[in-house]
């Protein structure tokens, strides 16, 4: 039997916590026998004293085990359970293509996703732009979709890692959100509760990233890879660029439209293709679905070219109560803003930098994201035809097309877009789309 205050005291004094102490505290959070003040105190001691790798693994496992851990054995699936998690960005719509692509190659992708957070878009918000799409199927329906379709994208239910919800809410109001051991445990508790064989992390770097610097992004990626592998889930991470909007669009309906066009081959943004392919390659390799990178790329290209990936996406939408002909008729189903017109720079020049975070906040201000958890979402608004770094802009080449529902909103968004984009005389040095691969 332990006392919560003694566990806090031990960590306060810089001593490592045992697996049993960590599990006791986390179960206490779940069972409401540990107070908010005690959670806040432990979070702050971890923030200042960090955690060893064994402590980080124990914390993650305890948070995972605070609720249901999915078990797929009874389904006798003939392929690996694999997933991807992104630290979030703007125009980061990879999940919508990646899940179907990997499923079309023989993987099973039970993706539990989130809402938009701050300037970053949320996969669930994007999918809810599809009429009727059910992000909370019951457990039986979820399992059936995975078995029959190979991929489902759903929201987190209250039974998955419940301790994390309470822990995170306390961190949010005590300035302890940006603690790497706590971020790692929060991300992985939910992902490992999916019962995965393998996971790939997409950790963003740059002006639209969760972490403010490259070195902190790299630290987070290494921490997640180390802890997840320590917890028995084969995990790799890619550090990818978020110094500009990843897709050509940012918003909800507009990103779903781009995802369908990507899958059908109508249009594939080169940067989005590079990141999506690289993440899918990791999933195929970690899941044993390909011999090497070349084999993985060939398989993925084949399911794009022969239409299998688009077909799987359509089947997933139908299985989750969306329209059965969504892929064929997406334009007739997705909401359209009343006002769509381009915004131009006030002078001629070359785009040398983008404040990607500010562009994400411009979408939020249009109604495409939430300032408070209770805010409604406008699925029709957003940015499309985003100019890229190094593009020369003038009276003919716009910065973006803004989709708004009134002139005032359009004007505010236009000001925000202009302010977020820096022009100069010389093209910026090209940054890699993928900076680094982390395997341990």
From Swiss-Prot:
Its EC number is 2.4.2.4. GO terms for biological process: pyrimidine nucleobase metabolic process; thymidine metabolic process. The keyword Secreted does not apply. Keywords: Glycosyltransferase, Transferase. It catalyses: thymidine + phosphate = 2-deoxy-alpha-D-ribose 1-phosphate + thymine. Pathway: Pyrimidine metabolism; dTMP biosynthesis via salvage pathway; dTMP from thymine: step 1/2. InterPro entries: Glycosyl_Trfase_fam3, Glycosyl_Trfase_fam3_N_dom, Glycosyl_Trfase_fam3_N_dom_sf, Nuc_phospho_transferase, PYNP-like_C_sf, PYNP_C, Pyrmidine_PPas_bac/euk, Pyrmidine_PPase_CS. Homodimer. The enzymes which catalyze the reversible phosphorolysis of pyrimidine nucleosides are involved in the degradation of these compounds and in their utilization as carbon and energy sources, or in the rescue of pyrimidine bases for nucleotide synthesis. Belongs to the thymidine/pyrimidine-nucleoside phosphorylase family. This is Thymidine phosphorylase. The gene is deoA.
């Amino acid at each position: 039997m332990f006392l919560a205050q003694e566990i806090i005291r031990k960590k306060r004094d810089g001593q490592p916590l045992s697996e049993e102490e960590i599990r006791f505290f986390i179960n206490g959070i779940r069972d409401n026998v540990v107070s908010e003040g005690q959670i806040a105190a432990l979070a702050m001691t971890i923030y200042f004293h960090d955690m060893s790798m064994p402590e980080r693994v124990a914390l993650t496992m305890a948070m995972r085990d605070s609720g249901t851990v999915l078990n797929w054995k009874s389904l006798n699936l003939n392929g690996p359970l694999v997933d991807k998690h992104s630290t979030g960005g703007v125009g980061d719509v990879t999940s919508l293509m990646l899940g179907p692509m990997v499923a079309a190659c023989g993987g099973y992708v039970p993706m539990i996703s989130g809402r938009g957070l701050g300037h970053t878009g949320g996969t669930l918000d994007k999918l809810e732009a599809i009429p009727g799409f059910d992000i909370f199927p019951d457990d039986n329906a979820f399992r059936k979709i995975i078995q029959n379709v190979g991929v489902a994208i759903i929201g987190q239910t209250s039974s998955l890692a419940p301790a994390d919800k309470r822990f995170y809410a306390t961190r949010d109001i005590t300035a302890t959100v940006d603690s790497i051991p706590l971020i790692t445990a929060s991300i992985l508790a939910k992902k490992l509760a999916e019962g995965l064989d393998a996971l790939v992390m997409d950790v963003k770097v740059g002006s639209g990233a969760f972490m403010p610097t490259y070195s902190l992004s790299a630290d987070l990626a290494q921490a997640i890879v180390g802890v997840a592998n320590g917890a028995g889930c084969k995990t790799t991470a890619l550090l990818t660029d978020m110094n500009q909007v990843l897709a050509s669009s940012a918003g909800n309906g507009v990103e779903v439209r781009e995802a369908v066009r990507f899958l059908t081959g109508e249009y594939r943004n080169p940067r989005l293709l590079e990141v999506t392919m690289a993440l899918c390659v990791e999933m195929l390799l970690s899941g044993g679905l390909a011999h090497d990178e070349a084999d993985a790329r060939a398989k993925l290209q084949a399911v794009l070219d022969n239409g299998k990936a688009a077909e799987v996406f359509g089947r997933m939408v139908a299985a989750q109560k969306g329209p059965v002909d969504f892929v064929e008729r997406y334009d007739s189903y997705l909401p359209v803003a009343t006002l769509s017109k381009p915004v131009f720079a006030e002078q001629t020049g070359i785009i040398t930098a983008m404040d990607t975070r500010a562009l994400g906040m411009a979408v939020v201000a249009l109604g495409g994201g939430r300032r408070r958890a209770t805010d409604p979402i406008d699925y029709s608004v957003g940015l499309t035809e985003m100019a890229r770094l190094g593009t020369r802009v003038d009276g003919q080449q716009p910065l973006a097309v803004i989709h708004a529902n009134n002139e005032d909103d359009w004007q505010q968004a236009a000001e925000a877009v202009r302010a977020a984009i820096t022009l100069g005389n010389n093209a910026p040095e090209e940054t890699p789309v993928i900076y680094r691969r982390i395997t341990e």
